[in-house]
């Protein structure tokens, strides 16, 4: 029996004025999730979702596009101001923050929440190119 390719219901519009933009920037990708103050997801996007493949996902331009897409989704739900939490060492950190400001969201605070180990697990070996 063939599976039905269903159309998913569009989520109800959430009226959220302020929120938190979580930017997770890795060496390979940049993920942006915009939540309300309690942490419930309002909108999200990533460089991979937008069609960037391979090494193009890790570029600042891909992070900028992902950030703009997430911001537009959040603004459809009525979001106006965001606090930004940046996590990770990737190259798309600053580009994503600038794109959030350019789309019309007011950035009230920027926090770096990159986890720093207190001498935790052993890091990967150094690359010899």
Swiss-Prot record:
<keyword id="KW-0699">rRNA-binding</keyword>
<dbReference type="GO" id="GO:1990904">
    <property type="term" value="C:ribonucleoprotein complex"/>
</dbReference>
<protein>
    <recommendedName>
        <fullName>Small ribosomal subunit protein uS11</fullName>
    </recommendedName>
</protein>
<keyword id="KW-0694">RNA-binding</keyword>
<dbReference type="GO" id="GO:0019843">
    <property type="term" value="F:rRNA binding"/>
</dbReference>
<dbReference type="InterPro" id="IPR018102">
    <property type="entry name" value="Ribosomal_uS11_CS"/>
</dbReference>
<dbReference type="GO" id="GO:0005840">
    <property type="term" value="C:ribosome"/>
</dbReference>
<comment type="subunit">
    <text>Part of the 30S ribosomal subunit. Interacts with proteins S7 and S18. Binds to IF-3.</text>
</comment>
<dbReference type="GO" id="GO:0006412">
    <property type="term" value="P:translation"/>
</dbReference>
<dbReference type="GO" id="GO:0003735">
    <property type="term" value="F:structural constituent of ribosome"/>
</dbReference>
<comment type="function">
    <text>Located on the platform of the 30S subunit, it bridges several disparate RNA helices of the 16S rRNA. Forms part of the Shine-Dalgarno cleft in the 70S ribosome.</text>
</comment>
<comment type="similarity">
    <text>Belongs to the universal ribosomal protein uS11 family.</text>
</comment>
<keyword id="KW-0687">Ribonucleoprotein</keyword>
<dbReference type="InterPro" id="IPR001971">
    <property type="entry name" value="Ribosomal_uS11"/>
</dbReference>
<dbReference type="Pfam" id="PF00411">
    <property type="entry name" value="Ribosomal_S11"/>
</dbReference>
<dbReference type="InterPro" id="IPR019981">
    <property type="entry name" value="Ribosomal_uS11_bac-type"/>
</dbReference>
<keyword id="KW-0689">Ribosomal protein</keyword>
<dbReference type="InterPro" id="IPR036967">
    <property type="entry name" value="Ribosomal_uS11_sf"/>
</dbReference>
């Amino acid at each position: 029996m063939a599976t039905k390719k269903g159309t998913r219901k569009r989520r109800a519009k959430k009226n959220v004025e302020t929120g938190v933009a979580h930017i997770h920037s890795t060496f390979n990708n940049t993920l942006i999730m915009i939540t309300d103050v309690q942490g419930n997801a309002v909108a999200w996007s990533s460089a991979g979702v937008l069609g960037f493949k391979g090494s193009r996902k890790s570029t600042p331009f891909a992070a900028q596009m992902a950030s703009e897409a997430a911001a537009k989704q959040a603004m459809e739900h009525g979001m106006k101001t965001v606090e930004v939490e940046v996590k990770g060492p990737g190259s798309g950190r600053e580009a994503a923050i600038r794109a959030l400001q350019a789309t019309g969201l007011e950035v009230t605070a920027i926090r770096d929440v990159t986890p720093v180990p207190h001498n935790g697990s052993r890091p990967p070996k150094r690359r010899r190119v």
